[in-house]
From Swiss-Prot:
Family (UniProt): Belongs to the mannitol dehydrogenase family.
Active site feature: K211
Organism the protein comes from: Emericella nidulans (strain FGSC A4 / ATCC 38163 / CBS 112.46 / NRRL 194 / M139)
Gene: mpdA
GO terms for MF: mannitol-1-phosphate 5-dehydrogenase activity
NCBIfam families recorded: PRK02318.1-3 (NF002647), PRK02318.2-5 (NF002652)
UniProt name for this protein: Mannitol-1-phosphate 5-dehydrogenase
Catalytic activity as recorded in UniProt: D-mannitol 1-phosphate + NAD(+) = beta-D-fructose 6-phosphate + NADH + H(+)
């Protein structure tokens, strides 16, 4: 039986990655810095995952796990990594830099011949490469090249707002996709982990961009239009014909990029879009627009779900008007209770000039063909609050 270390004991960690590592026969060690969460995991011998679909619900029991607090027990985490088979994480792209030092120490402490598999399960393009970059700053190059295999992945599974008093149990969408590149393992001449839930591919880029620019773009577009319209859930928002039309227009534009760039057929992409719309329309998920819309600063950043596809479309001379509309709605997601980034967004738009705000939020160069169009939308939103 192997051992997996997973950074991030939240709903994605327990309800997606943890589930599939458990089913693959691994003992899972959850690592987090939230004291109450770690204590709860340590004191709870099992938890349930309820998969939700329009056909009903199915419950699974998860066991054979432990938990460690990397803040107070870093040395223990280092020793666990030193003897682990796989390290995964679901902590958010901006937290990767903070987990890198302990992973670096764990690699330095390894004396097993098989390299450690490292997979960052984040909603970001090539997040494992990002994590590797942070680890490289903390240890010698030969430690990384000899003792680890880093593989990027694309993940897709909706984890809605959880009911109160749900404990460690997780309600989660039945549908899932976990695609991981196998090339790094081939290059090292080692076998990839035997996790049946993972779809191993040679070329990951099409999967990452298709997922990010369809699922995440469509989901967030629905949330931002829905928020402005006073809708409570994603399903409610998509029942509004005007919002549904706007979402389809956005996904038509991202589809044109995916088809043009990756050679995916128009019919295949259309079926993928239809499946995504059906999934996020599922009323049984009870997925709140504020949950999906949270962290607007990250979602408006350069390589994310709006500026990412819009910038590439602009560079190719293709249409991006609907994406501009979604960007404008995202700019209006301000001062939402419980979301610090929405408050910071309001502050930036209030205190900075339109040019300063556009550059800070999007990281676009001023001579980029998208820049002036986003600048115009920033000005529009700023003028509304004057």
């Amino acid at each position: 039986m192997g051992k997996a270390i997973h950074f991030g004991g939240g709903n994605i960690g327990r309800g997606f990655v943890g589930e599939f590592l458990h089913e693959a026969g691994y003992e899972v060690v959850f690592v987090d810095v939230v004291d109450d969460l770690i204590t709860s995991i340590q004191n709870t011998p099992s938890y349930e995952i309820t998969e939700i679909s329009e056909d009903g619900e199915k419950t699974k029991k998860i066991t054979n796990y432990r938990a460690l607090n990397s803040k107070s027990h870093e040395a223990d985490v280092v020793q666990e990594i030193a003897t682990a088979d796989i390290v995964t994480c679901a902590v958010g792209p901006r937290v990767l830099q903070f987990i890198a030092p302990v992973i670096a120490k764990g690699l330095e402490s390894r004396n097993v011949s098989t390299p450690l598999t490292v997979i960052a399960c984040e909603n970001a393009i090539n997040a494992t490469d990002t994590l590797r970059g942070h680890i490289e700053k903390k240890t010698k190059p030969e430690i990384i090249s000899e003792r680890a295999v880093f593989a990027n992945c694309a993940i897709d599974r909706i984890v809605p707002n959880q009911p109160p008093n749900n404990g460690l149990n997780v309600r989660i969408e039945k549908y899932w996709e976990w695609v991981v590149e196998q090339t790094p393992f081939k290059e090292k001449g080692v076998a990839h982990p035997n996790v049946s839930a993972i779809h191993w591919v040679d070329k990951l880029d099409p999967y990452i961009e298709r997922k990010l620019f369809t699922v995440n773009t469509g989901h967030a577009t629905t949330a931002y239009y829905g928020h402005l319209a006073g809708k409570k859930t994603i399903a409610d928002a998509l029942h509004d014909p005007k919002i549904r039309e706007n979402v389809h227009k956005v996904l038509d534009e991202t589809a044109s990029l995916i088809i043009n760039k990756h050679g995916i057929s128009e019919q295949e992409q259309k079926e993928y879009v239809d499946k995504i719309i059906s999934r996020i329309s599922n009323p049984y998920l009870e997925d709140g627009v504020e949950r999906v819309g949270r962290a607007p600063l990250r979602k408006l950043s350069r390589n994310e779900r709006f500026i990412g596809p819009a910038s590439q479309l602009a560079e190719r001379g293709l249409k991006f008007d609907a994406l501009l509309g979604a960007i404008e709605q995202a700019l209006r997601f301000q001062n939402v209770e419980g979301d610090e980034e929405s408050k910071e967004l309001a502050k930036i738009l209030k205190e900075k000039t339109a040019e300063e705000a556009t550059s800070e939020l999007t990281e676009l160069e001023k001579d980029h063909p998208l820049y002036s169009h986003v600048l115009e939308r920033v000005r529009t939103v700023q003028q509304e609050s004057k």
